[in-house]
């Protein structure tokens, strides 16, 4: 079983994560957000790289917000060391010299990804929004139901309010960065940008450049900003942006031309199948690999009676098309959503209704049912696809799920070792 944590249900505000879990599977919501079970096993490489990359980003933006405190560029490795200690990658008194090679590799990938992001023309963070004297850089925000109704216009129907009020005081969230872009703070017509950064260890392709459908995460955070007045009390437009940053390794020429390379196909040329590649490859690297391998093949077949094997017209065409495709790939890709306030109100009400439904079931003595998914790579069948899959599937049905979960807890299979969320700060500002 994966190592778990268990604490009494101390959730006081609804988060976007709780809404997503409530919509996805009642049993998982029941285990995580009502019984308080949390997965606390070691994080995988993507999660580690993402956490360390966010630490670098936060250090950079905070330096922009307070240039008098930072006389020079921020120390990314110092920021990552603090994050590594907080998330228990390292002991509280450990240093980088005590880190494993895997952790050092992850830190190097995160450092490179942060540098790629900051130097990208897509990165326009210059002036973060300041709330209660603090820049909104990975700061946890809380808003009560009264603030949401008064500032955001999020007035809950009576049935929804009766289900939520006894259990939840309001909403909470931790936006990555909220900023004004290149505009001056005094420019009231300038929009507020709500950025969510994803550090991807695998290539990301086909990310839409713009989307008119309200994103649930953006809608949720927009309600928080409106309730706390961070959007100029409704005078500023809020634009939600998801920024995908490639944080994996880049393939080199040697990856293709080394003897026995697995990235060379039977024709002797470099593969164009990106699923076989361990990372992204730049167009100029693949072009040079194709040239070297083609020349190597031609020399190796020079003694053939029919002459050396030369590239065919089809091989030339496919290579040029792939090179052109690679030239359009970006290490930083941005998706934009313009958040219409009326639409966002409906989206967030639906999200809150999912949590209210689960709470009402528990209040009525009904254990929320499981949502079993059995297709290939589904969370219920994929190894480590769900944090509570083992005790959930060990039960004989939803009716005795609580007993099964508590039995696992009583046997000591769930341990208390709570990890903080990415970017959480203990001294984050709360709504007054």
Predicted regions and their residues:
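RecB-family 4Fe-4S metal-dependent nuclease core
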Residues: 1-432
